[in-house]
Amino acid sequence: GEKLTSPDHYILKQSVSEIVKVNTPAEFRIEILPTDGYEMEVEAPINLKFATENYPDLIFDKVSFSKKDLNDIKRPVFSGKITPKKAGEYNIKGELSFVVCTSTICEPKKTDINLHIKAE
């Protein structure tokens, strides 16, 4: 396959159902793709946490995710549902932390997540 490259040694892929009806879940998916010969450090924590206190009108089916929520630790994909109780636009923030390594070096990563949902 093609060799993925990034100065951060990983690429983040985020997707979300951007427009939903009120009381209908928006599904999100957040994928970490290590690049440049780096791989996920499977012994290290892989955590995703949403800042839910800012969003009283959203129902998160889960707020905090860890390795046990992943099907494949080497190809991590976090997915879940966020349901808006009121119409409006929401910028949902979270934080993702993980470690990528080569055979000789490890780099802890921490990155902001930003999902945008519009509820009609």
Where do the model's predicted regions map?
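Extracellular/lumen-exposed scaffold segments
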Residues: 1-120
